[in-house]
């Protein structure tokens, strides 16, 4: 136990010790000067019986923990679901009783996850996100920079750190905070519902909630390919829980994939291993847990389809006449009439004004080539959506696509 130095006339500062007597010379170093806080504090850390915290992150040489359960002076455990506590600088397991942040006390929300980026703490509840600025070395100068409602998370594994910022999956999309603002990575890229984008069953509402209506999306970041991997369910809590989306930060595009994960299996959270590989453990219910890593390499995929958004050319109310589409591509396989179109948001590629472009993919022997696609006659429309059926064999790449059209200035949709 600690005993403070005391002063006695004729002896000076000393500590009584039964074995060795008194210290004659005063000690310049005291408990307070060494540790930065008084020895009289009753609470120094979270580690008593049944004391816990449910979220944590290390930033600016401090540990931040949230959603804590602490023992009160009465000996009873008291829960602070909306409290964030922080350690002393460089003392990552020392939490003083007055080192806490109550950003929104009394809003009945509990913190689910913490992350840090660009001198900010991102504190997630189920229904909102707090962005707290901790750039100042003085604690009293920390402040709540932004509160964003309806962008919370349901699990810690729905949040991940990337070199581009903090990414997370909320109820209505996948978001990124880049140190300046929050943006929706899925906006106008993944359909909200079947009717909102294409005639495909791949849409956010059915994928996010799954057959069991459980919201447990797991998110990981692969630093090698600079990609996000968004898995439907690590707990097999839905039919086809292996369904996944992959986001490429370099192209800003999403890819739907059912071959990365195995349905009816159970997965650990993602980690980044010693070799910078995104890894996780998988259990199929019968054998031992097997650890696997994500490898961003090309593999065979069947029945691939590509859809553009409904393109209005910047003039949504005007009638346009579309003459041709020019595609720069290379392919190891041939494909007959792979491009189709739908008009005016109707999502029909065979009727209601939709149809097939004339023009075939050729085997270019891994060299870039240009394909000109034409409709049977110029298409008059407000907007156009293009669908592409990938070759059934081989590897293909599309570099760019341009549409030749003319706005009919004196004709507007009625």
PLM regions: where:
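Disordered, low-complexity "stalk" and linker segments at domain junctions of extracellular
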Residues: 1-76, 91-100, 188, 195-198, ...
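Repetitive beta-architecture junctions, highlighting loop-to-beta-strand starts
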Residues: 2-3, 61, 82, 127, ...
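Non-cytosolic beta-sandwich-type ligand-binding/adhesion modules
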Residues: 5-10, 15-22, 27-29, 302-414
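Surface-exposed loop/turn elements that mediate protein-protein interactions on large endomembrane-trafficking
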Residues: 5-16, 29-33, 75-101, 133-141, ...
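Viral virion structural and adsorption modules
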Residues: 63, 129, 174, 268, ...
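Beta-sheet-dominated scaffold domains
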Residues: 70, 107-297
């Amino acid at each position: 136990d600690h005993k403070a130095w005391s002063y006695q006339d004729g002896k000076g500062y000393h500590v009584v010790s039964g074995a060795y007597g008194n210290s004659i010379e005063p000690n310049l170093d005291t408990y307070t000067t060494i540790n930065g806080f008084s020895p009289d504090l009753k609470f120094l850390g979270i580690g008593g019986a049944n004391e816990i915290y449910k979220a944590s992150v290390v930033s600016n040489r401090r540990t931040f923990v949230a959603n804590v359960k602490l023992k009160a002076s009465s000996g009873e455990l008291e829960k602070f679901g909306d409290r964030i506590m922080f350690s002393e600088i460089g003392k990552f397991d020392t939490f003083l009783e007055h080192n806490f942040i109550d950003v929104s006390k009394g809003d009945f929300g509990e913190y689910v996850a913490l992350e840090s980026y660009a001198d900010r703490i991102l504190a997630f509840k189920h229904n909102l996100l707090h962005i707290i600025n901790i750039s100042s070395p003085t604690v009293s100068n920390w402040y709540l920079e932004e509160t964003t409602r309806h962008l919370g998370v349901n699990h810690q594994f729905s949040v991940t750190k990337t070199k581009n910022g903090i990414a997370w999956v909320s109820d209505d999309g996948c978001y990124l905070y880049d140190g300046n603002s929050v943006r929706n990575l899925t906006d106008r890229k993944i359909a909200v519902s079947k009717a909102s984008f294409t005639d495909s069953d791949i849409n956010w509402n059915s994928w996010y909630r799954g057959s069991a209506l459980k919201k447990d999306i797991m998110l990981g970041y692969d630093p090698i390919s600079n990609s996000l991997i968004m898995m439907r369910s690590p707990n097999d809590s839905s039919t086809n829980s292996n369904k996944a989306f992959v986001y490429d930060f370099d192209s800003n595009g999403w890819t739907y994939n059912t071959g990365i994960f195995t349905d009816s299996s159970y997965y650990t959270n993602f980690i980044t291993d010693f070799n910078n590989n995104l890894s996780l453990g998988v259990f199929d219910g019968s054998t031992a847990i097997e650890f696997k890593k994500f490898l961003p390499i090309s593999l065979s995929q069947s029945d691939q389809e590509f859809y553009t958004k409904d393109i209005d050319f910047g003039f949504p109310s005007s009638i346009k006449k579309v003459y041709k589409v020019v595609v720069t591509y290379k392919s190891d396989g041939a494909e007959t009439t792979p491009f189709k179109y739908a008009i005016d948001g109707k999502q029909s590629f065979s009727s209601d004004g939709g149809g097939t472009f004339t023009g075939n993919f050729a085997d270019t022997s891994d060299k870039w080539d240009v394909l000109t696609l034409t409709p049977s006659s110029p298409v008059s429309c407000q907007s156009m959506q293009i669908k592409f059926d990938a070759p059934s064999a081989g590897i293909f790449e599309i570099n760019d696509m341009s549409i030749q059209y003319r706005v009919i200035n004196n004709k507007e949709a009625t």
